Amino acid sequence: FWLDKYHIDGLRIGALSSMLYLDYGKTEGEWEPNKFGGKENLDAVDFVKRLNTAVHMYHPDVMMFAEENTSWPKLTHKIEDGGLGFDFKWNMGWMNDMLHYMSLNPMWRPFNHDSLTFSFYYAFSEKFLLPISHDEVSHGKGSLIKQMPGKYDEQFAGVRAFITYMYAHPGKKLVFMGTEIGQFDEWNHEEAIQWDLLEFEKHKKLRTFFKELNKFYLDCKPLYELDTVWKGFDWIHHDDYANSVIAFKRTDKNGDEIVSVCNFQPIRRCLLYTSPS
């Protein structure tokens, strides 16, 4: 119905773990194992496979997303290869790590450097989407800019650093509405986005930043062509804890490269890194 009548671009299956595991959120005695003695919900697995197959058959341009917070394997692999057939998995680990890291006073970030780099260890195990969704800017959590530490100007700088790093990181991008104008109030489904903020210079410049970054991203194939495989990524420097800096290289199918150097301290740096290649 949603695909046929409203022509939506994709479907997200939320809380997928509660479907896939018979014991999810239950204590001993509240669930029974499957016929093989395991905790996997075989009926749910079959339903998900059939759902993804049907969507891709009748609407091949529609994307299917999995929000799953465990390490269920092969969510985005082909069904014939033992997968569940989703197009992308929400990278909840990256999201939680980065929101925690960016909320820290910069002086504490050197002690939490692993939150910045850990996602690269599994970045290519699935086809990932990097999500900043409605869940992260509502329910008392505050908007993205409100979660940034420091004074007014520093919060805008925090958003720019976070989003630029997000666009350089392997994985597709999802940014929730209102983030692009620096809305300080968290999202409320009963209210509109506060477009009047664009009367203020900082908010207007932030929207321009998003506009230019999106254009740069679309024009820069190394940032997305090999988004799901190690071939498109190389570390240059990942353990500069003291300076809160990481550097890496992205590559496209033709071998063209772009280098990303991310500084998460409010201090100008002059650093020399040597690429392993």
Predicted regions and their residues:
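Solvent-exposed, charged/polar functional surfaces in cytosolic regulatory/catalytic domains
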Residues: 1, 54, 212, 216
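Conserved, mostly hydrophobic/aromatic
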Residues: 2, 13, 64, 213, ...
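Active-site groove signature of glycoside hydrolases
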Residues: 3-23
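Conserved alpha/beta catalytic core and glycan-binding cleft of carbohydrate-active enzymes
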Residues: 7-9, 27-189, 218-222, 227-271
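Extended hydrophobic/aromatic segments used for targeting, binding, or gating
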Residues: 193-196, 208
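Catalytic cores of secreted or luminal carbohydrate-active enzymes
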Residues: 202-223
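Conserved small/polar residues in nucleotide/adenosyl-binding loops
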Residues: 273-277
